[in-house]
Amino acid sequence: MTNIRKTHPLMEIINNAFIDLPAPSNISSWWNFGSLLGICLILQILTGLFLAMHYTSDTMTAFSSVTHICRDVNYGWIIRYMHANGASMFFICLFLHVGRGLYYGSYAFLETWNVGVILLFATMATAFMGYVLPWGQMSFWGATVITNLLSAIPYIGTDLVEWIWGGFSVDKATLTRFFAFHFILPFIIAALAMVHLLFLHETGSNNPTGILSDADKIPFHPYYTIKDILGALLLILALMLLVLFAPDLLGDPDNYTPANPLNTPPHIKPEWYFLFAYAILRWIPNGLGGVLALALSILILVLVPLLHTSKQRSMMFRPISQCMFWILVADLLTLTWIGGQPVEHPYIIIGQLASLMYFLLILVLMPMASTIENNLLKW
């Protein structure tokens, strides 16, 4: 008799995706982040659901309701901090997952890669709207500054901003709709993640060498299930260390002050995972230019497959490209640091150089390095 997991219509889908899936025998720990992102998403949806049971999306009571969750709700404090720091873990996994894709040439799977870029955008939108919900000073001013960027769009900018706000300033209507979107988007992300997996399973996974691995495949279970469980345990360990020992390490003290439209904080800045994009935004003094640079800083990922000039897929055997990749990583860390600094000398010039370097590396230097390597290998 055939096993039920191979015959039952629902079980068959799960079986083909997580049990009998043929996987390359040599995929390293860098391939763990897909499953870790799935765990992060489930964790965020569950903690978010319990938070939503006690949260009120009204300007008068939002801040108080978050305080109430932390003080009065049973284990409310741990749910709140798991949700806030879970977002940080989510983005750490996201950045490492994208970095893995860039390094090993996983972007050659066009559909998978493009759905991944959409997922990145959706996750960033969700995180931004979530940051507004506690209605602290940084929530309010972050929402005001970031939504106001759209006013730089010619002709329709001002109307667009007021339409998003639901009025003439960030107010009750804005908070209510942000809560609604923040609640629905993770489910859209979950659906997109399934599409992401669907496209991936059409081609099969890439591997560190970038060479076709059809000749050497192993079943996903038990080899990669046990490997993913180890990754999950390490992720949960890191998250709980953060939640239980330094829950406010990555937050902003300003967000413990209730929102006040009459008092602007000295330094308005987003959460750490948006700082690199925020630095690129501030790089161009012109409003529209900054907004375009901000959008392009993420959209540029769509161009990466078109800019691939190497005859090899992975960077595993390409030392010059490896150098370029790690310079890009250092550049992004520099941008993250600059994004959190005030707009004054020497930070302005460092930010401008780092932003210029970011676009130069992806658009010019990395394709050039690949071409040089091709010539060195007489390809």
Curated annotation (Swiss-Prot):
Gene Ontology biological process terms in this record: mitochondrial electron transport, ubiquinol to cytochrome c
Record-level GO cellular component terms: mitochondrial inner membrane; respiratory chain complex III
Gene that produces this protein: MT-CYB
Origin superkingdom: Eukaryota
Gene Ontology terms, MF aspect: metal ion binding; ubiquinol-cytochrome-c reductase activity
Short name of one Pfam family: Cytochrome_B
Binding site for heme b b566: 97, 196
Anything else known: Heme 1 (or BL or b562) is low-potential and absorbs at about 562 nm, and heme 2 (or BH or b566) is high-potential and absorbs at about 566 nm.
Keyword Plastid: no
TM ranges: 33-53, 77-98, 113-133, 178-198, 226-246, 288-308, 320-340, 347-367
Cofactor binding, per record: Binds 2 heme b groups non-covalently.
Assigned protein family: Belongs to the cytochrome b family.
Protein name: Cytochrome b
Lineage: Eukaryota, Metazoa, Chordata, Craniata, Vertebrata
Glycoprotein recorded as keyword: no
Annotated a ubiquinone binding sites: 201
Cofactor(s) in the UniProt record: heme b
Keywords, comma-separated and alphabetical: Electron transport, Heme, Iron, Membrane, Metal-binding, Mitochondrion, Mitochondrion inner membrane, Respiratory chain, Transmembrane, Transmembrane helix, Transport, Ubiquinone
InterPro entries associated with the record: Cyt_b/b6_C (IPR005798), Cyt_b/b6_C_sf (IPR036150), Cyt_b/b6_N (IPR005797), Cytb/b6-like_sf (IPR027387), Cytochrome_b (IPR030689), Cytochrome_b_C_euk/bac (IPR048260), Cytochrome_b_N_euk/bac (IPR048259), Di-haem_cyt_TM (IPR016174)
